[in-house]
């Protein structure tokens, strides 16, 4: 066949498009991906027929599917579908705007060439949805926004005496505009158009207009343009140097006899949000969940927003400062981002330098803009990512990872995980069951193997040893912590020894305790811990731990509890899948009754239900995956938000929240996979939060896909993963748009933008040189002097009891119980399989 990459790429469109047709034929309504694939695939087939022009196909693409054939929110979320194909006269782009624009569409076009039966229209009843239930719905406050407030303004009369149109952007020094414009140039010295940032005014040939001018902010130092008034603003220059330059350059000028003060410019909030994203007081619905966030603060300046593009703000002499060395300016600015983090839900520009977040606030050009945050200058050395209408979170940490196969890391990155902590050496039985990289030999191999993978890695050594020699060896070989697992014997002496060594080396201990109660009950384990800090894995117990009451550790200040995601949240199918998972990952045999009893003892509906409640109250502080050993690495984030959505449904708003303002709950849940695991494992000084001084590991989401599908992953300030279209296409948005590795994922770049987390002892023994690694090696720190009180939004320590016969769980005397969910958000609406 000798196919080109662009042809094999399009086979993805055909495969999913055909699958979507089959699903539609049997009466299933389509989700977003299926809808795009079906229309794209059919367009390709019509192109292949060679009987339609580009213009005809742009119209035909609207006449396939109707609103009744797709899920709620799909029509509003698909603004454009673009494909490229080979016409008789070459390869051309077909753009279909608003492809779902009728109720019924035309299924004859949707099924053309498929030979599938066309289903009756009666199978798809139309159901229009209220606007506030749409995916990612936005509710703006009512009062207008005043831009460029408290600045001097006047009305200026302008005429285009030229023979071609002239368009002037918001932050262009109006004095410097095209010589064919005739107006009072001396009057305009130090002023720009009083219009929303990034917009423009167009002057057609011969047209006269009166526009409002507003004085520049900042230091009023001008550069660029036509060079008429370069330098600091000086009123004395208006009638001297500036006038001379205008006359010398032949710039159109006419004295304006009457000068009127201009009114303050106001913007409708919906219009503002469409341009710059939501601002203070606006509310956003997250995906299809009944979770709403309200913007708490906007650090940008109304009228001075950074906006990139043709004729917009970030140009030389406008929002981009002139004459700066690269060390004076940002490497990257993310403009108008809505940040969702444990420390707030707010709007800001994010500045990145050398892969580190160096500023969160207002970026731009302090020479000509008000409110620019120190250290956030945009210059000609600055790259831009438009954050408008996107949500940004810190990269997720999954701190319960079995390193069974390299393919896990691709799935992790694609889902929004940027840091993994765990152990293993591949699909060995020990690694299938436990997160232990057990020796110096394997530690070196795994650190080397992941040296070019665009994730931050931490490796835990095996902590199951009543002696100390092997524990010291593995920590000094690069382990950032120890894992104590019952499959290797989680006895009191083992726990005590591991914690003693951890205290000595300042690393964390992750505990999977004794389901068998072989050496004692949970009380024996707590006695062995002796009040020292420990990370309790899958604290509910289905993943392992003292049966049936390991969950009581949630009451202790020194225990940092986490959940793994197979039980997140409790659903009608949760228990039925667990037995087979347990048998496989813990090397059990269904023919041995004791193995069956062991597995059964870990599966309890009562404690799984209680886990939902304790996650929601903040008594369980973290969520991780336990990937390929019962959990799913690509669903850490998704299952966290499903839990949050379920618990709002059953428990209502948290204290301090409202039905349409869930900021406290959102901060609680985002902390579970960002800041809290970072604190637990001694990494929060560099990762786990959107904060100055932290690595720029950032995840970009649309509101309608929040928690399900990231748009882009930034790794150490470099784009490592993104939704990207056909590489041969004329523009990057041509189908198939799928998640793909970007330049930051290339091996040499990955080593530059990522960290390997190790012990300080290993650095003292020159690990980097011994292992010849390229990644930045950082020591974990402050793993031992922390406790539950340090868990952000998740520091509750209720008095816990578990009935050993009924398994009922009480926290502070209150039964922790919710029914299993039979339907959850972030499910079929978002995923093809």
Curated annotation (Swiss-Prot):
Protein's organism: Cryptococcus neoformans var. neoformans serotype D (strain JEC21 / ATCC MYA-565)
Molecular function via GO: nickel cation binding; urease activity
Required co-factors: Ni(2+)
Amino-acid positions noted as binding Ni(2+) 2 in the UniProt annotation, renumbered to this chain: 483, 512, 538
Enzyme Commission number, as recorded: 3.5.1.5
Pathway the protein takes part in: Nitrogen metabolism; urea degradation; CO(2) and NH(3) from urea (urease route): step 1/1
Textual note on the cofactor: Binds 2 Ni(2+) ions per subunit.
Post-translational modification as stated in the protein's UniProt record: Carboxylation allows a single lysine to coordinate two nickel ions.
Protein name per its UniProtKB record: Urease
Family as reported in the entry's similarity comment: In the C-terminal section; belongs to the metallo-dependent hydrolases superfamily. Urease alpha subunit family.
Assembly notes: Homohexamer.
Keywords annotated in UniProt: Hydrolase, Metal-binding, Nickel, Virulence
Active site: 586
Enzyme class: hydrolase
Domain Urease: 395-833
NCBIfam families membership: PRK13192.1, PRK13207.1, urease_alph, urease_beta, urease_gam
